């Protein structure tokens, strides 16, 4: 994806649910991965700090990516509901995230 915007953020999995988090992502719904791709997200990875439960997400976003459109999609909300019992979430069940500032990049 040319002119992709790199995006990094943290989330948190609840203590004791690290394995379940991995299982659910190993079984991610194909229609959700399609939605993410169609929305302009590619090259998406999530890493886990096993000591703290902090999840580090990194993704590339197309220049036309619209987070509000994805956030309001019923399938995205269904996924958030599915994950809400094992993650720190906002009142709407979206994961609590902390955006990270890029301080170095090497291609």
From Swiss-Prot:
Predominant subcellular localization, coarse grouping: cytoplasm
Pathway recorded for this protein: Carbohydrate metabolism; L-rhamnose metabolism
Positions bound to substrate: 21, 44, 79-80
InterPro entries the record matches: Dimeric_a/b-barrel (IPR011008), L-rhamnose_mutarotase (IPR013448), Rham/fucose_mutarotase (IPR008000)
Keyword Cytoplasm: yes
Domain of life according to the entry: Bacteria
Description of how the protein assembles with itself and partners: Homodimer.
PANTHER family from the UniProt entry: L-RHAMNOSE MUTAROTASE
Protein name: L-rhamnose mutarotase
Organism: Flavobacterium johnsoniae (strain ATCC 17061 / DSM 2064 / JCM 8514 / BCRC 14874 / CCUG 350202 / NBRC 14942 / NCIMB 11054 / UW101)
Biological classification of the source: Bacteria, Pseudomonadati, Bacteroidota, Flavobacteriia, Flavobacteriales
């Amino acid at each position: 994806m040319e002119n992709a915007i790199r995006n990094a953020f943290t989330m948190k999995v609840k203590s004791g649910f690290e394995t379940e988090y991995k299982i659910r992502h190993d079984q991610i719904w194909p229609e959700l991965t399609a939605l993410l791709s169609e929305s302009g997200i590619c090259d998406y990875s999530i890493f886990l700090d096993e000591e703290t439960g902090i999840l580090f997400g990194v993704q590339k976003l197309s220049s036309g990516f619209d987070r509000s459109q994805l956030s309001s999609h019923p399938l995205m909300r269904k996924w958030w509901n599915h994950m809400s019992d094992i993650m720190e979430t906002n009142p709407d069940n979206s994961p609590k995230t902390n955006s990270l500032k890029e301080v170095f990049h090497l291609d």
